[in-house]
Amino acid sequence: MFGSSRGGVRGGQDQFNWEDVKTDKQRENYLGNSLMAPVGRWQKGRDLTWYAKDRAPCTGPSREEELAAVREAEREALLAALGYKNVRKQPTGLSKEDFVEICKREGGDPEEKGVDRLLGLGSASGSAGRVALSREDKEAAKLGLSVFTHHRVDSEGPSTAPSATRKKPRAEDKAELDAESHKKSKKEKKKKKKKHKKHKKKKDKEHKREADSCSSSPSPARPRRQRHSDFSPCYKRKREHSQDSGRNPSHRRQDRSSDD
């Protein structure tokens, strides 16, 4: 009717003992994986309290040392920004690929260029002027890379032809020259158009002035055309009558007396 009674003590702490739990056959029914009484083969012979033991000391710098290093770096950066400290830039040397590229740009082989055949930065004369850097060299200088500015020296000496020292124009230089010439031609065309417009405006103004002067001056009197009616007999009679009426009355009386 009732199940089998299990072993163990249901009393207080004074009646409980861990050794009895370890030796009990039915401990898995009421006890989990406890550190005091490990159950199963995975817990036997293992250090189950490894996390509670002290760890090995760290070999890296402590937090205080790291904070002190950060503060020092910030102080140096602030002094450099304010100008109280000179920033020393470490020059980066040319790599082999950069050296080969520069030699190709100048048109010579890197093996032919020895140390004896190269001029240093201070060996150029004062009249030689500054070295014209290409676009790639300028970009490299902006990034902080060292620019190769040496020039090849011929064995003939300083009396070499200037044409030999000149570099061949590259495609980029040609493109820049073409763009500049195109801009100049555009500007010239604009100037010509402006001049043509000004000249045209002047001509129009002169024509307007002439037309105004002609309209303001009195037109010459045209000869009056004789109408066909002037030669008609009716017109002649009217004319004679007007002439007779315009005479003096004394003349009219004389005419009448003569008629009588």
Curated annotation (Swiss-Prot):
Phosphoserine PTM positions: S123, S127, S215, S216, S219
TM stretches of this protein: none
Keyword Phosphoprotein: yes
Gly residues composition-biased segments: 1-11
Residue ranges with Basic residues bias: 183-206
Amino acid composition bias (Low complexity), ranges on this chain: 117-132
Cross-linked residues, Glycyl lysine isopeptide (Lys-Gly) (interchain with G-Cter in SUMO2): K22, K104, K113
Ubl conjugation in keyword set: yes
Keyword tags: Isopeptide bond, Phosphoprotein, Ubl conjugation
Superkingdom: Eukaryota
Pfam family membership, one: MMtag
Residue spans of biased composition, Basic and acidic residues class: 106-116, 170-182
Record region (Disordered): 1-21, 106-133, 148-260
PANTHER family found in the cross-reference section: MULTIPLE MYELOMA TUMOR-ASSOCIATED PROTEIN 2, MULTIPLE MYELOMA TUMOR-ASSOCIATED PROTEIN 2 FAMILY MEMBER
Protein name as catalogued: Multiple myeloma tumor-associated protein 2 homolog
